[in-house]
């Protein structure tokens, strides 16, 4: 609901500053991909690097974690003390791969949702039991449209002109086109 581009650019950090006033410890998890992880981390205030961890919820999960590790290191933080929560379309194979890659480098955790409780892909003809996505997001606030960019362009939401504005304002970096599993 920001009036100017500058207010818009600072809005995610203002929300997180408010969150920090209310919550401690394990509830201080950064979700950076709303307007693009690369731009979010590039403009993030230093105090945010002291939070408990980060949730990687779109784009390539390994690339997202590597970006977070590099960001923490630039801010003098020890990545091995940080929590990385991977949570986008995970299955057993992805969890095992990410766990191996980041073992000893970060505290890895996995938000395993739909594919934990509905991994019946291919059991019936025509994928009759295929999982579906049930995600609720606000589409407007105070009569103005909302926008979500994500690190995956397939997850973008909002009017095209506003998406273009947000990409410009937040300096959206590289987006990884990944098929949406659910």
Cite the ranges covered by each PLM segment.
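Buried, small/hydrophobic-residue-enriched core segments of structured protein domains
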Residues: 1-64, 97, 102, 140-144
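Gly/Ser/Thr/Ala-enriched C-terminal appendages of enzymes
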Residues: 37, 50, 59-82, 87-182
